[in-house]
Amino acid sequence: MNKSLTTSVARRMASAITAAGATPHRVHFPTVGLTAHLRNGEYLTRLGNRWRIPMATMVAPAEYLRAVGGDAMVAAAGPGYVLMGETSAELRGAQVGDSIVLRDIRFRMRTFTVGAIVPNAFVDWGDIFMTTESAQVLGPMSISRVVATNITSYSRIISKLKSRGIIIGSTYRMRTSWDSENPDGTLGISTLKKKFGEFAFRPAGGSAIQIDAKWKLTNILWRHSFADIRLRNNCHKVAVKAIQGALSEIKARGLQRHVDVANANRYGGCYVGRYNRMAGSFGAPSRHAYGAALDINTTQNYQWSVPKMNCDVVRIFRKWGFAWGGNFWPADGMHFEYVGERRDNIGYPSKYCPNKVPVPTTTLPTFAPGATLTTTTTSSSSSTTTTTTVAPITSTM
């Protein structure tokens, strides 16, 4: 299932942003397969037999990049060039001037040059950025977001969207760079790879993917038995200690009846080699493919339904370093995703199971002429740039 913006809806969003005096940009987030990495004509990585490394790719117009990164960054992302995030570059030892071979929608080879290595924010905490113009050779891709820059009035954008039938909060969401930290926010792909390891994969029919056997042998603990609450699942070794800590605390607090062990052991668990159910033509591996997420109580908490997970259980998992899917768009109440940092001490107006700590006051920034507002799922505040994102309901399972 792919939830993206139709061309018609994206056009209405752009019209609203323009009417509000700002500049709209269509943004795409395909996951593109990398099959080779070269330096001075020598292969550093070369994959065959349809194996590929998933590269989380941000695609946006050059004028968007100019608004948030300046002229020098646009020059580095010229035709046939990509910007690579610093974490992704670290993972593969990439340098400026290296060549990477990406595969288009028909799995044909397309070669790009690394024009610059940039802070992760400029690749949306993924792997690479390329301009819309450069990405045309990859083939058609779904519209993920409409981003606004050069904003003078946030409220005016909301008003103009509403007048065109774009209601924020039901089918669509708005994200801004001044948003408070979300306790259920997930890791960017490059951070996920650094924590859990990067793998190669190839399609295995339908939503299934085959993942590199060496990566699985190194990282997945097969049929691991947890104590206190007797789950037995295939999970990533990095997440196992935190899962055990959460389960032990749930048991110690007398909440074990809220974990359906039989259901979790048969229908839930961590590792599944598959695409994200929300992936499009350029499919992204699920967080479960990394063994980084745990599903429990699946019958009562199926995707899109109002979550029925016990809130004390939710907060315990947050304490042990998990984001909860009950506040994803759409809700995925069975899903706990390891992020590696405590999340129960973050005040945020969560729709379901908010933490029991004060919610900080959010101050709307002052918009000067030329300020930038973009819409993104994971955005960070900057002293020079203000950003906001309009996007359809999506998930990162």
Go through each PLM region and give its residues.
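Active-site acidic/histidine clusters and adjacent loop/turn architecture
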Residues: 195-262
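Second-shell loop/turn segments in exported
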Residues: 2-3, 78-79, 146, 225-237, ...
